[in-house]
Amino acid sequence: HQRDRYAKMGFRLPVDRSFVLPGRGTIVTGTAATGRVAIGDSLHVHPGDRRFRVRGLERHGEAADSFEAPGRVALDLAAASTDDVPVGAVLAAEGTLLETVRVDAWLRALPHLVRPLKARQRVTVHIGTTHVEAAMTQLSGEVLPRGEAAFVQLHLDRPLAIAGGERFIVRSSAADPRFGQTIAGGQVLHPAPARHKLGDPAVAQALGQLFEGEDDDRVVAMVALARGRGVDDAELAQHLDLPVDVITRALKTGLARGRIRRFGRPPRYLAPAVVDELEAPAWIELEKGQLGKPAIAAVALGSEGAAARATPL
């Protein structure tokens, strides 16, 4: 069942080898965590805007027409060079992966540390087959004792293609006397979050649901973290490590139970608490006769018809 879930998600392959095979061309290898790929498919190389067609593939040294994750795979890419697809790049199905400079994550400090992790500090994050310098902030605003876990926000020095659910390790940065020492390990919860206020209980609750909640709870939590801008179907699929059909079912359940609100066309989803915050000023504007803002009108009126015509929030 779990393998089926992985296979139904977008294909993603962090490249750990890239080389030229005489008579074949450029070959890349890696461990694909999710998705399916077949000969003839076009894959997006992240970071960047290059795309290459899969000319051939092998699994366990055997040629095949298609591959289903998880597992090791080698891909023969048409018209690509090793410079086009270097080690550290990520190959992904079109539109399924984000390049980001900020992520929310669950983090556990290793038990052997002499000192706790600071509330804010520079670190090196190793994720996929690459690494990046980052500023790490404890969202509690407090230090993290050795062996303890917390939610953090990582501000990356350069954009990386990162998926929800990815695991990573953290090492001390060049600015730290313990340079290169492994200090923590973690899991990405949100690959493209907003900045958060430190010590915000609503953020902590949503991240807790993303980390260990059921599928329905995780979708509700991701909608809540979108705040007033809301989130659409494509963004939910990019942010969550869940198959699209699971997200669709969770949205229907959340809407039916009043845990999620929907506005606009194409639809965007908001948390009920966010809608409540918007309703008060919207009603004031309506009472003043300010009906020129359809999104505000839709929120205030709570009308399916008005909501369908509303500009997305």
Predicted feature locations:
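Conserved catalytic-core segments of large NTP-driven translation/proteostasis enzymes
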Residues: 1-111
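C-terminal effector modules of nucleic-acid-centric enzymes and ribosome-associated factors
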Residues: 62-66, 79-313
